[in-house]
Amino acid sequence: LITSSTHAVLDNDYGKSKKQSEDALIKYSDECDAKVYIFRLPNLFGKWCRPNYNSAVSTFCYNIAHDLDVWINDPAIELNLVYIDDVVASIIDCIEDENIIKLKNIDEEVAITTTGASSIQIDKYYYEVTTIYRRTLGNIVDSLKMFRNMRKSLLIPDLSDGFNKALYSTYLTYLEEDDFSYYLDKKEDNRGWLAELVKSEQFGQMFVSKTHPGITRGNHWHHTK
């Protein structure tokens, strides 16, 4: 099993080197009747990836986590992205020969979201990770800046979105230890005090409060909120 690159179809030195590696493995498979798995990965991102190397996402995460400038030439450029955990799940499933969709032809439409499969078998040799995210550079940077501002805004992202969850998990690995704690804005009067913990456009807000003895606060309910 090897992870190749979607650049293998390009007519440049990098693409040619990837294609030659694939061809060598295919030749071995044909000569020895051995099962091989070739994954052509698009842009790979994930936790603890080395910044300022070959992953734009890791560089963005590192820079924004450290309040460094991020420069992008065209925010509208769209990337195809795979998350490292999904790649690992696909590799394990191939080894165990389970959770794999086998296509009859490369143009076949597959209801990936309802199958639960981690991999698609394109042909005898080639496989794809089913979960591929498509996001623009501008969208990625905006999301990361929102994460950085969370300590002030207390607004958390929509973690029901798979990409947001993967990107946030990735971003956290670039924070310094001191960045994991932060002060809350404590509001206090003669009744007691309260402080907001988190807010979300999906579920409202959560806060902690303390009421002094003999004081009644709230004392009402909501039919709908």
Task: Locate predicted features.
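A conserved pocket-lining segment of Rossmann-fold NAD(P)-dependent short-chain dehydrogenase/reductase
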Residues: P42, Y62-V82, K102, I112, ...
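A short glycine-rich, His/Asp/Glu-containing loop-to-beta-strand
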Residues: D179-H223
